[in-house]
From Swiss-Prot:
Protein localization: Cytoplasm
Record key words, sorted: Amino-acid biosynthesis, Branched-chain amino acid biosynthesis, Cytoplasm, Leucine biosynthesis, Manganese, Metal-binding, Transferase
Function: Catalyzes the condensation of the acetyl group of acetyl-CoA with 3-methyl-2-oxobutanoate (2-ketoisovalerate) to form 3-carboxy-3-hydroxy-4-methylpentanoate (2-isopropylmalate).
Region listing for Regulatory domain, in residue ranges: 390-512
Lineage: Bacteria, Bacillati, Bacillota, Bacilli, Bacillales
Binding positions for Mn(2+) per the UniProt entry: 13, 201, 203, 237
A single GO molecular function term of this UniProt record: 2-isopropylmalate synthase activity
Cofactor(s), by name: Mn(2+)
Protein family: Belongs to the alpha-IPM synthase/homocitrate synthase family. LeuA type 1 subfamily.
Protein's recorded name: 2-isopropylmalate synthase
Highest taxon of source: Bacteria
GN (gene name): leuA
GO annotation (BP), single: L-leucine biosynthetic process
One Pfam family of this chain: LeuA_dimer
GO CC aspect terms: cytoplasm
Amino acid sequence: MKKIQFFDTTLRDGEQTPGVNFDVKEKIQIALQLEKLGIDVIEAGFPISSPGDFECVKAIAKAIKHCSVTGLARCVEADIDRAEEALKDAVSPQIHIFLATSDVHMEYKLKMSRAEVLASIKHHISYARQKFDVVQFSPEDATRSDRAFLIEAVQTAIDAGATVINIPDTVGYTNPTEFGQLFQDLRREIKQFDDIIFASHCHDDLGMATANALAAIENGARRVEGTINGIGERAGNTALEEVAVALHIRKDFYQAETNIVLNQFKNSSDLISRLSGMPVPRNKAVIGGNAYAHESGIHQDGVLKNPDTYEIITPALVGVDKNSLPLGKLSGKHAFNTRMEEMGYTLSEQEQKDAFKRFKQLADAKKDVTEEDLHALILGQSSESHDAFELKHLQVQYVTGGVQGAIVRIEERDGALIEDAATGSGSIEAIYNTINRLMKQDIELTDYRIQAITAGQDAQAEVHVVIKDDNGTEFHGIGIDFDVLTASAKAYLQASGKSKSTSKQADFEEVK
């Protein structure tokens, strides 16, 4: 039975989703959960792209102990050097080098001839091989590349020392039949491929990312790249949970096994959904809210008699626990910490103390603290602990003619308090106009979403906002509170803080 490696790029390609901006602490939390999930390789980022990305890759490389960590690099020596520096503390570092091979990319983006592309591949793969034992090469836009030239580029990379060849369907163009044939062609034409690991990286523009990844595995790929929940730019990437469960359920067909701990998928999905601000569609395969719901009377009757009648995946297989008992104000520290571990959170001793204190405050306000409340509690603690600005006071009042007014006081990281007031056509607009005055910013609110974390009158509100700055960059913010207006203010303030922080970093890079 063949062994399939899982390569997770949630922290790199997944973060290219508009409005998704993970900070260092969030990325480490996600990486630790991916490690529990059994991911073989974590792509932590693109080290040379920014000082922030470099620090994230470096921190993840130091934190992860049981799987490989890799960084992305172009065919540029400086990129490779920067990746080596970022990954020096990794227990099993790898590097992922890419260069486009399609005619449209070579002509309009790279402005390089085929000969120049081949020479660059040869030089930079050889250069990287001197620094890394595992070198992965990706011919970007492979599925739209001339087949003969693609094979020549792959052979060049292997001859120069590449140990992994990843075939990206960069724009989600291919289909399972074509993609499977491509892997057959590579295995037939490439010389000395026995020790080479072939991989797939599929996008979902035509809705076939998972099917294409499985077609690659069926035709010789031994590594699959993707993200949790399928997040990524445009229509997203291959959803790793779908591939892993498909390989498990249809082991009779694929004859493949993995290192994936399937019952960690629910925790992984929940964590990434909340930190990214991207809700999982209820009809999403494997981990959607409706995945194990049965509306039809005939289906319900069948499932009650024998679940196998309509369920090929049991909820427990992917970590969906329908019988999880809520915690209450009498629950102790041990029970709380145990539940945190079961939910996939790795907290330091101080973080455990802070979280338990917040839990007790929450338990005093709610009869039952559910798993959803606990996710929100940790998310709120994580986001507030590194916010550059903290909401200290909010007052909303009716003015005249339907106009609302808001007074907002915030505390900056250095402890300074600033306060201002503004009006708006409603309470939310008044609050956001006031924050804009305080932050001296002119931004566009592109998305506002509110949801109750649990049912009942004592439910907390979770508000997600997305804002866009002058450069068109989007930033996501989360706010959680029993009061909707306070949660809304927290979310907008967090997104604004991220925008300010990125602006300062950009100014630094410009000066540098």
